[in-house]
């Protein structure tokens, strides 16, 4: 039994290979035949694989596999390259047959030099390590140990291996005999098949539709650089907050209420509950934890909004929210500037260490911030809007919460152009009017630069969870960060008075009822339990929300959100 297993683990070659090799009528394999990837050959190969699946998909726990590799020290491609590639003097361009190594990886390419020497480029995906690229294997008939039968079937066995197969290579470090003297693993045993590929990869994949429909093939052909950068960004976000003694928590995703942001929720049910909603933001749960006694909390996770999908929006997306006690709006702005400096400087080092290409927008952002001493540009909401419109929205006699007064204060040409249905003010809220004015006259005109721009002191009607400015009751201690016209961050001093919070919730509900447009306001159910919880005492607290997917788009220089999601948007996911 052990002998049989050992032969299987050593060869893992199809039986038809052994039979054909014994035949005196077998013709020598030409180079063209050795690398043939025709459908006929793939079909024949797959037929043999299907007949003996255990042989071509062995368990890594198989005893024969361990017995065979006892003399060999298992290392990764990165370990091998770091030890020998970075220090060629270690080997002095000489083979070292006394150092036996075992390396697992995937075949990237196979090249035959006659019938007795095979060159294999082995790689192991991409872990983001500088030396974790690939390694050349040299499989030379004259240096392969084992039985005479193994050596007799060398050509047949090596021709069975194809691009995409996973193998275990056994050998010692050395160099090719060419003038280049390329560092290689000189195999002294035939490579062991760990898993085979049954579908050949296309030579390239550039069509966007096909990329969206098969991300697995896309990553194999075009690389996983975006995934690596995204993973590093999330790791750095955690490190920044962990280093400042924030506590990471997980709050409910499924509950009977999804309050916390202006969005339409996904509604579902379960065996035990008739009405459940997916969260649209973790905000109110995180603030409950602040009330419970935690000083600094954060959560990185998914939120869900039942709204449209476009280049910057998906139905599910990742956010970071953190809350810190005793923080003013200016303190949160400073914290945000520090966060961007930390992210960008550490990502710059990551790009250097991994030799990944530095995206253009990342370089531009790095330059813009470093030249401005890592400070953001600031634009105040109402004063800037006044200047753009040539009016005074801060007039003490004007109530911007009333749509009729707000529309009347606008220049006639502006009102006619952007609010043609102005006469029917019952269907148009101040929230909608101010959002439109902000989009046209603030975001489009003042937030298009690479240098991050802060719009601050948003009107109270736009900010139901934010603290009111003590100097001007019509605005709040809130700010948003824009880069090249897109919003990335929303932050503010949190309302901590239960009575005022309830008033703001009721005001939002009233707007809901007047406009009949629930997609632009809070979920219609007021969270009275949250208001009641506030009465136990809520300290002054600053809150911060960041869209991680958009940040990844910015740092990776991607135009669409699906490009930074592992499997794209919902419609892409449904096709895979």
Swiss-Prot record:
GO terms for cellular component: cytoplasm; mitochondrial matrix; mitochondrion. Catalyzes the attachment of lysine to tRNA(Lys) in the mitochondrion. Its main location: mitochondrion. GO terms for biological process: lysyl-tRNA aminoacylation; mitochondrial lysyl-tRNA aminoacylation; mitochondrial translation; tRNA processing. This is Lysine--tRNA ligase, mitochondrial. Belongs to the class-II aminoacyl-tRNA synthetase family. GO terms for molecular function: ATP binding; lysine-tRNA ligase activity; tRNA binding. It comes from Saccharomyces cerevisiae (strain ATCC 204508 / S288c) (Baker's yeast). Its EC number is 6.1.1.6. The gene is MSK1. Keywords: Aminoacyl-tRNA synthetase, ATP-binding, Ligase, Mitochondrion, Nucleotide-binding, Protein biosynthesis, Transit peptide. Present with 2280 molecules/cell in log phase SD medium. Coiled coil: none annotated.
